[in-house]
């Protein structure tokens, strides 16, 4: 029944608990059988999402509550996955904004909420984690209201219902002093405040594909919301792509969501979010319609990429030892496969057959792709992320980001100085009276590349940093965020030995310990000065029959610095690459031998 259908998207900042909230909604509605084993954080389906605690792909689930059926779409919180967010908004009639009762709305919440308002959706606000120490729900409600006013919300959008919840304990209420035993107030609010889909049941079929899934058994699965009409298995349809080309196809199965599973359905009606198989190669934004009434829905717009980097074939001496897929053809095939469902990604071939230029919405967007490829057994070398400049009205412009930092007062000075050097403008400063300060900045994207790891060191790991893309504006002159220190480069291939590493410790910090395999041109540490230094880490202690009268000195090594993929990408300079294999992340110079490096430097100077 169409009157009993509700479509809703969940918006939240990373770590404000939306995925846990969906868990509880599913469990308490009785959608899961009493016998079914329930996983924690059911919505984060791939390993990477579970490890990082972030949602990357938008996902769908459906809940039966009393006689109502509620379709819930989980949206990614990061602006880097803006391409995903854009499409979700076209499928739903309202949004559930989940905000932490202590943190309040964050810049990434702002990004997604802005998109929702642009689509004319009305919000329901859920203040989550009201049981956490230091929770200040009333302050958060004021902050949310201010945010909505800043985003030019209409009067209807500003008249939003507020539900207080503690998703972990599975309780909700209309007042944070007086909570119900379970989530009923939230279900009730969804049913009361979300409009039923406004669609035409009797017209000819029309639906738009807003997500794609793939399954080896049935091939490409298109997911979307039926705009009007009905669809049955084995029905003949016409598909229109974004360029207006049409082709005919026959629907395989029609699947509706229930809980986390997809269930075969004999018929699906307008307003429902369904998955459909058997239509061959589909693309996002394709319209599926009745062959007698071929009309396309407006194409979904996606934000343009702002950061690009080169993916190259791994040319190091250890190439092919750890990974299964190493050739340029395999890398290109994998990137093209990613393009099918990762809409905000761009891949271009370059003059060099072994390098591809990959552009995305931000460092996180690209590093998630690299991490996924690495887990699948790929080996590749990647360059430093670079910002994409645009020419607008004859003027060269660069992307700017809104950054929110939350730091302890003692670190405030050094953080503000560092952001000043990186050409950031302070927009707002808000001390919370308990020793922490929230700073709001607008900063060029290139000023942020490499800043996160420096920021973590500066605040001894206590600082929080969130950023989202803001706008394009004129370029600020001068270089930003150059690395201050040089690096230590290995001069040969073999096993690093403790005796040699011990002698190098005075020169800087090392990336590897005793027994690690190294090759010529690999970066093995950070130099304590600003120049690069080629060093020998392979020489063991010579054995002679002469011994000092005392005992030998004990060789004690400081534990090496282990870098994650993001840290390595932020650390490198333009003449360096990160070598990524399934088991290790190494950093190397683009030119491996010292002679090649000198020649390259000479060439640059002559230019």
Swiss-Prot record:
InterPro entries: BipA (IPR006298), BipA_C (IPR048876), BipA_GTP-bd_dom (IPR047041), BipA_II (IPR047042), BipA_III (IPR047043), BipA_V (IPR035651), EFG_III/V (IPR035647), EFG_V-like (IPR000640). Residues 3-198 form the tr-type G domain. Its main location: cytoplasm. Its EC number is 3.6.5.-. Changing residue 427 to A: No longer binds to 70S ribosomes in presence of GMPPNP. CDD domains: BipA_III, BipA_TypA_C, BipA_TypA_II, TypA_BipA. Changing residue 527 to K: Still binds to 70S ribosomes in presence of GMPPNP. Gene3D superfamilies: 3.30.70.240, bipa protein (2.40.50.250), Elongation Factor G (Translational Gtpase), domain 3 (3.30.70.870), P-loop containing nucleotide triphosphate hydrolases (3.40.50.300), Translation factors (2.40.30.10). It comes from the Bacteria. GO terms for biological process: ribosomal large subunit assembly. It catalyses: GTP + H2O = GDP + phosphate + H(+). Residues 481-607 are annotated as: C-terminal domain (CTD), required but not sufficient to bind 70S or 30S ribosomes. Ribosome-associated GTPase is not affected by low levels of ppGpp, >40 uM ppGpp and >50 uM GDP inhibit GTPase. The C-terminus (residues 387-607 or 481-607) inhibits GTPase activity, in its absence kcat increases, but GTPase is no longer stimulated by 70S ribosome or 30S or 50S subunits. Changing residue 544 to P: No longer binds to 70S ribosomes in presence of GMPPNP. GTP binds at residues 15-20, 128-131. Keywords: Cytoplasm, GTP-binding, Hydrolase, Nucleotide-binding, Ribosome biogenesis, RNA-binding, rRNA-binding, tRNA-binding. Changing residue 586 to A: No longer binds to 70S ribosomes in presence of GMPPNP, altered secondary structure. Induction: Induced 7-fold when cells are treated with human bactericidal permeability-increasing protein (BPI, AC P17213) (at protein level). A 50S ribosomal subunit assembly protein with GTPase activity, required for 50S subunit assembly at low temperatures, may also play a role in translation. Binds GTP and analogs. Binds the 70S ribosome between the 30S and 50S subunits, in a similar position as ribosome-bound EF-G; it contacts a number of ribosomal proteins, both rRNAs and the A-site tRNA. A ribosome-stimulated GTPase, GTPase activity increases 4 fold in the presence of 70S ribosomes. HAMAP family: BipA. PANTHER family: TR-TYPE G DOMAIN-CONTAINING PROTEIN, TRANSLATION ELONGATION FACTOR-RELATED. Monomer. Belongs to the TRAFAC class translation factor GTPase superfamily. Classic translation factor GTPase family. BipA subfamily. Has 5 domains; domain I (residues 1-202, also called the G domain), II (203-305, also called the beta barrel domain), III (306-386) V (387-479) and the C-terminal domain (CTD 480-607) which is BipA-specific. Domains I-V are homologous to domains in EF-G and LepA; although the domains are similar, their relative arrangement among these proteins is different. Domains I and II are not required for ribosome binding, although in their absence no 30S binding under stress is seen, whereas domains III, V and the CTD are required to bind both 70S and 30S ribosomes. This is Large ribosomal subunit assembly factor BipA. The gene is bipA.
């Amino acid at each position: 029944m169409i009157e009993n259908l509700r479509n809703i998207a969940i918006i939240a900042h990373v770590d404000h608990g939306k995925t846990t909230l969906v868990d509880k909604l599913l469990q308490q509605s009785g959608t899961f059988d009493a016998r079914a084993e329930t996983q924690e954080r059911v919505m984060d389906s791939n390993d990477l999402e579970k490890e990082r605690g972030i949602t990357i792909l938008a996902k769908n689930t459906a809940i039966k509550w009393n006689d109502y059926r509620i379709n819930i779409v989980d949206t990614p919180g990061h602006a880097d996955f803006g391409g995903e967010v854009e499409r979700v908004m076209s499928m739903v009639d309202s949004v559930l904004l989940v905000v932490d009762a202590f943190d309040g709305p964050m810049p990434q919440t702002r990004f997604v909420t802005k998109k929702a308002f642009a689509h004319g959706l009305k919000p329901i606000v859920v203040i989550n984690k009201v049981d956490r120490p230091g929770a200040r729900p009333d302050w958060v409600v004021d902050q949310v209201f201010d945010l909505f006013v800043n985003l030019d919300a209409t009067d209807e959008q500003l008249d939003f219902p507020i539900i207080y919840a503690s998703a972990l304990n599975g309780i909700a209420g209309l007042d944070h002093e007086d909570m119900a035993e379970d989530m009923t107030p939230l279900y009730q609010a969804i049913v009361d405040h979300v409009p039923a889909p406004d669609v035409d049941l009797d017209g000819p079929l029309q639906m738009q594909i807003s997500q794609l899934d793939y399954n080896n058994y049935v091939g490409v699965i298109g997911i979307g919301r039926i705009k009007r009409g009905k669809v049955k298995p084995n029905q003949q349809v016409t598909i229109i792509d974004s360029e207006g080309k049409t082709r005919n196809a026959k629907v395989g199965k029609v699947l509706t969501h229930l809980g986390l599973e997809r269930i075969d359905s004999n018929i699906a009606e307008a307003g429902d979010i369904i998955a459909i198989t058997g239509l061959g190669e589909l693309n996002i934004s394709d319209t599926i319609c009745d062959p007698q009434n071929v009309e396309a829905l407006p194409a979904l717009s996606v934000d343009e990429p702002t950061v690009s980097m080169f993916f190259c074939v791994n040319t190091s001496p250890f190439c092919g030892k750890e990974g299964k897929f190493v050739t340029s053809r395999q890398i290109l095939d994998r990137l093209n496969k990613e393009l099918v469902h990762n809409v905000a990604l761009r891949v271009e071939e370059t003059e060099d057959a072994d390098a591809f230029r990959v552009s995305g919405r931000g460092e996180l967007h690209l590093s998630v792709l690299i991490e996924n490829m690495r887990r699948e057994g790929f080996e590749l070398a990647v360059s430093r992320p670079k910002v994409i400049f645009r020419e607008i009205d004859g003027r060269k412009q660069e992307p700017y980001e809104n950054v929110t930092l939350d730091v302890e007062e003692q670190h405030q000075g050094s953080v503000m100085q560092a952001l000043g050097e990186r050409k950031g403008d302070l927009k707002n400063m808000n001390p919370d009276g308990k020793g922490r300060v929230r700073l709001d900045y607008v900063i060029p994207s290139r000023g942020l590349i490499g800043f996160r790891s420096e920021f973590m060191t500066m605040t001894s790991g206590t600082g929080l940093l969130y950023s989202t893309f803001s706008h394009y504006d004129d370029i600020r002159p001068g270089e930003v965020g150059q690395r201050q220190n040089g690096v230590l480069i290995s001069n040969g291939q073999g096993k690093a030995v403790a005796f040699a590493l011990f002698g190098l410790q005075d020169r800087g910090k090392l990336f590897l310990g005793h027994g690690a395999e190294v090759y010529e041109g690999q970066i093995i540490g950070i130099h304590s000065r600003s120049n690069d230094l080629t060093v020998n880490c392979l020489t063991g202690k010579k054995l002679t029959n002469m011994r000092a009268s005392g005992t030998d000195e004990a060789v004690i090594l400081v534990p090496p610095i282990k870098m994650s993929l993001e840290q390595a990408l932020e650390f490198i300079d333009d003449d360096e690459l990160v070598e990524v294999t399934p088991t290790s992340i190494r950093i190397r110079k683009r030119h491996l031998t010292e002679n090649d490096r000198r020649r390259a430097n000479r060439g640059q100077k002559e230019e």
